[in-house]
UniProtKB/Swiss-Prot annotation:
Topological category with respect to the lipid bilayer: Multi-pass membrane protein
InterPro entries named among the record's database cross-references: Cyt_b/b6_C (IPR005798), Cyt_b/b6_C_sf (IPR036150), Cyt_b/b6_N (IPR005797), Cytb/b6-like_sf (IPR027387), Cytochrome_b (IPR030689), Cytochrome_b_C_euk/bac (IPR048260), Cytochrome_b_N_euk/bac (IPR048259), Di-haem_cyt_TM (IPR016174)
Transmembrane segments: 33-53, 77-98, 113-133, 178-198, 226-246, 288-308, 320-340, 347-367
Compartments, as annotated in UniProt: Mitochondrion inner membrane
Protein name, as recorded: Cytochrome b
Organism in which the protein naturally occurs: Cervus elaphus roosevelti
UniProt keyword annotations, A-Z: Electron transport, Heme, Iron, Membrane, Metal-binding, Mitochondrion, Mitochondrion inner membrane, Respiratory chain, Transmembrane, Transmembrane helix, Transport, Ubiquinone
GO biological process, one term: mitochondrial electron transport, ubiquinol to cytochrome c
Length: 379
């Protein structure tokens, strides 16, 4: 008798994606982040759903409804902090996942990579609108500053901003629509993630060597299911350490002050995972230029397959490219630090140099280095 899991219309899909899927025998822990992102998404949707049961998206009651969740709802505090810190874990996994793709040349799977970049943008949009919902000072001013960037678009900018706001400033209409966006976007992310997986399974996974592994495949279950479970346990451990011991470590104290349009906080800054992009935005003294640099800093990922000049796919056997990659990582950490600093000497110049270096490494140094490596190997 043929196994039901191989014939049943629904179980067949699950079977081909998670059980009998042929996987390379040598994928390292860097390949765990895909499943971890899936777990993060499920966790965020579940905690978010329970928060939405008690949250009110009205300027008069939003802040106090979040306080009510933390004080009066059974285990509301843990749900709230799991959701807030879950977003941080989500972005840690995202950055690791993208970094893995860059290092091992996974961007040569064009459809998978491009859907991934769209996913990154969507997750960033979701996190941004979500940060506005508690209606604290940083929520309000963050929303004001970031949405205001759209006014840099020539001709239609001002109209566009007022259309997004639903008025002449960030107010009740803005909060209500941001809640609606924040509710719907995770489901769009889930759908996109399925498409991402669909395209990945057309080609099969890459592996650390970047060499086709068709000759040496193993079934996904039990080898990688057990490996993923270990990754999930570590993720949950790290998340719960954060939630139970330092829930406000990554948050901004200003967000414990209710939103006040008459009082601007001294330093407006987004959550830590946006600081690198915020630093790039601030490093350009022109508004439109800053916005373009901000968008380019993420959109540049789409160019990665075009900028790949090496005859090898992975960086595993390319020491010079490896050095550049880790310099890029250090540069991004520098930008993250600068994004959280006030706009004054020496931070301005450090931010500008780090921003220039970021684009210079990706657009100039990496392709040149790859070509040099080809020549050294007489390829």
């Amino acid at each position: 008798m043929i196994n039901t899991r191989k014939t049943h219309p629904l179980m067949k899909i699950v079977n081909n994606a998670f059980i009998d899927l042929p996987a390379p025998s040598n994928i390292s822990s860097w390949w765990n982040f895909g499943s971890l992102l899936g777990i993060c998404l499920i966790l965020q949707i579940l905690t978010g759903l329970f928060l939405a049961m008690h949250y009110t998206s009205d300027t008069m009651t939003a802040f106090s409804s979040v306080t009510h969740i933390c004080r009066d709802v059974n285990y509301g505090w843990i749900i709230r902090y799991m959701h807030a810190n879950g977003a941080s874990m989500f972005f840690i996994c995202l950055f690791m996942h993208v970094g893995r793709g860059l290092y091992y040349g996974s961007y040569t799977f064009l459809e998978t990579w491009n859907i991934g970049v769209i996913l990154l943008f969507t997750v960033m949009a979701t996190a941004f609108v979500g940060y506005v919902l508690p209606w604290g000072q940083m929520s309000f001013w963050g929303a004001t500053v970031i949405t205001n960037l759209l006014s840099a678009i020539p001709y239609i900018g001002t109209n566009l901003v007022e259309w997004i706001w639903g008025g002449f400033s960030v107010d009740k209409a803005t909060l209500t629509r941001f809640f609606a966006f924040h509710f719907i976007l995770p489901f769009i992310i889930a759908a996109l993630a399925m498409v991402h997986l669909l395209f990945l399974h057309e080609t099969g996974s890459n592996n650390p060597t970047g060499i086709p592994s068709d000759a040496d495949k193993i079934p996904f279950h039990p080898y990688y299911t057990i490996k993923d479970i270990l990754g999930i346990l570590l993720l949950v451990l790290f998340l719960m350490l954060l939630v139970l011991f330092a829930p406000d470590l990554l948050g901004d104290p200003d967000n414990y002050t209710p939103a006040n349009p008459l009082n601007t906080p001294p330093h407006i800054k987004p959550e830590w995972y946006f600081l690198f992009a915020y630093a790039i935005l601030r490093s350009i003294p022109n508004k439109l230029g800053g916005v373009l640099a901000l968008i380019s800093s993420i959109l540049i990922l789409i160019l990665m397959p075009l900028l790949h000049t090496s005859k090898q796919r992975s960086m595993m056997f390319r020491p010079f490219s490896q050095c550049l990659f880790w310099i890029l990582v250090a540069d991004l950490l520098t930008l993250t630090w600068i994004g959280g600093q006030p706009v004054e000497y020496p931070f301005i110049i450090i931010g500008q140099l780090a921003s220039i270096l970021y684009f210079f490494i990706i657009l100039v140094l990496m392709p040149i280095t790859s070509t040099i490596e080809n020549n050294l190997l007489k390829w």
